C-alpha cells in the first residue's frame, strides 16, 4: 500500500479492502441500479469508479444499456456526471444538477429528473419516498469520496458533505474513494444524523460555529466492498467575473444594509449571510469586504472564492456551509493557508446547512438569483419559459422561506440574440413559480431595490416596476399593470390584477419574434 494512502487509512480492517484497479469493482453495478454519489456543487464527488464505469460502457458499446438512477446531494463533478449523461448512463436524477449534457438529456426526455428542496432531499431518501417501488428502502451502491479514514473507521469527507451520511445509511454496498491528491480535511466537518419522526428533537445549534456532531461519518464496515485511491482533485472552473451590473446590485444591497442598521432592524454585524452562486453573489460578498461591516458570520450552502478575501480582511468571523466550491486558484489559496481557514470554516450535511429550523433561529439574510421575477414578486428559479429545466431549485427556497430577510437579485435584462437591450427579467407573470410572493422581502436589480415588506400586491407591482425594471421595458410593464388593474377593478377582482389573455404576451413574442418588446397589449 502506498505510504500516502496508508497514512490516510488508519483502520486495519479498511486497509484490507483496498482495490488497486477500479475496474475490478465494475461488475458490482447492474442496469437499473440505484446509485448514490457524494458531492455538492461539483466538489467532493467520486472520480475513479464513475470514470471506470464510463470506460466500461464506452469500450463495450453499452450506451443506453447500463443506466442508473443517480442520487447526489446536489451537482456532481462535470468530468464524471456529464460523461455519464453523454453515454446515456443516467435513467433518473435528483435533486439538482449542472452540465449541458445533463440538461440536454433532461429536456429531451431521456433523463427523468425531479428537483427538490435540498434540505428535504436527504430526509425524503430516509422516508423511502424515492425507493417505494423496491422491496426494501435501500439503494444498491453509494460511492463516497473521503480524505481520510480514522482509527475507529470514521469516513472523513473532502470539500463537501452534502447527502453522504444518508446515502451511506441507505446503501447496501459502499465504495470509498480516498483522495490523496488533496489534503486531509479532518477536523473541518460536523456530522450529525437526524432520526425520522416521531423521534426528532430540537437541533441544538444557536450560533454558526456550534458543533453538535462528530468530525466524520459513521459507516458499517460490512457494507464496504472496496476502497480505491483517487489521484486527482476536484475539477472546477473559474468563477464568473464581476461586471458593472453585478457591482451595481451589490452597491444597492450594501446601501440597504446600512439603512437597516441605522434604523435598528439589523445589528452592526448584520445577521448570518446566505449567498448563492454566480457573479452577483461574488460581487455582494466582495462589496462587503470593502464596507465598514465587520464580525460578519455566514450560514450558507456553498463557500466561493470571494469569501477568502473576506476572511483575510478579518471582517468575516466564521462560516458554515456544506460545500467549499472554490476555483482552481481559490483552492490553491485555501490549501496554502489551510490552518488559518480551518479554524473559521465548518462543513455540515445539507440537511443541517439548509435546515429551516436553524435558518429561522439564526435570522439569516438570504440572497439568491432567479431566472425571472414578476411584478408581484413571484420568482422562477428553474424553468426557462416555463418548461426548459436549467439546474433545479437547489436550496434557495430553504433559505428564502425561512430567513429573516429574503432577497432575490437579478439583472433587469439578460442578453439575447436579436434584441440589443436583451430580454426582461421582470415580467407581468412568471412562467413558473418556485418562490411565491409570500417568500420575498426584497427584489433588486442594477436599476434599484424594491422593498416589498408589508405591501399589498398592487403596491408591490408599482414598486417592482418603478425600482427594478429596465427603462426600455418599464413603460410596457406599467401599461400592462394599468390595463389589468382597471379591467379587474371593474369586475370586482382587483386584489392582484391580471389579464390572462395577455399575461404571457411578452414571452410569446420572444418565441415568435426574438424580442420581448411587444407592439401593444
UniProtKB/Swiss-Prot annotation:
Cystine residue pairs: none
Example GO biological process: acetate metabolic process
Name of the protein this chain belongs to: Acetyl-CoA hydrolase
Positions annotated as active site in the UniProt record: 301
Family indicated by similarity: Belongs to the acetyl-CoA hydrolase/transferase family.
TM spans (from-to): none
Functional summary from the UniProt entry: Presumably involved in regulating the intracellular acetyl-CoA pool for fatty acid and cholesterol synthesis and fatty acid oxidation.
Enzyme Commission number, as recorded: 3.1.2.1
